[in-house]
Each structure stands twice: as structure tokens, then as C-alpha cells.
């Protein structure tokens, strides 16, 4: 007869359901007074310069890319699907290929170096 110790696995206990807090209304910026900038600009400073610096950089980037013209569609496809140098029929379609059988693949010593496709 063998001794059985107490199981270390315990079933997860069901968590009591907690109702989410009720929505009172839309959140207003006054609730977060620490994060909100004052509505009136300081003296001597135009209101247009009070924008977020990150937003200003994005605007500059958009202007630079608009001046260069639209990028060719082929470039965007290459970024989405990097080429591996082994272009097979099933690859770009999204179908996965099975790995090659090691018995069928010749080593470089046995024959010429060939593509595994």
C-alpha cells in the first residue's frame, strides 16, 4: 500500500460577481484638474503655441511625407510580408507550409546546393 499525499492542485474558486459602478455621466475635465492646462493662454504667448509638442511633430511629419508624394504600394507590401529568399507558391497566400522531411532533403555534401521549395 502506498501513501497518497494531499493533492497540490486546487480547483479555482468561483469569484463573487461584483457589479460595475454606475455611469453617472460623461467625464468632465474639471474632475482631473491636475492634468488639464488652463483654458486662457498666458500673456505674450499666442494660443496656437500651447499645443502638445508631440502633436506638432506629427504635423511636421505629415507635411514632409505629403511633399514627397505617395509611396508605391509595393513598398508597403514588402514591409508587411518580408521576403525570405525562398518564394514558394503557397507562401504569399497565407497558407502555411509543412517543414521539409529530413530524409528527403539532400545535404550539400550529397548533391548540389538546391532550394528546399
From Swiss-Prot:
InterPro entries: GAGE, GAGE_fam. It comes from the Eukaryota. Residues 103-117 have a biased composition (Basic and acidic residues). Signal peptide: none annotated. This gene belongs to a multigene family expressed in a large variety of tumors whereas in normal tissues, expression is restricted to germ cells. These genes organized in clustered repeats, have a high degree of predicted sequence identity, but differ by scattered single nucleotide substitution. Their sequences contain either the antigenic peptide YYWPRPRRY or YRPRPRRY which is recognized by cytotoxic T-cells. Belongs to the GAGE family. It comes from Homo sapiens. Residues 32-45, 87-96 have a biased composition (Acidic residues). Residues 1-117 are annotated as: Disordered. This is G antigen 12J. It holds the Pfam family GAGE.
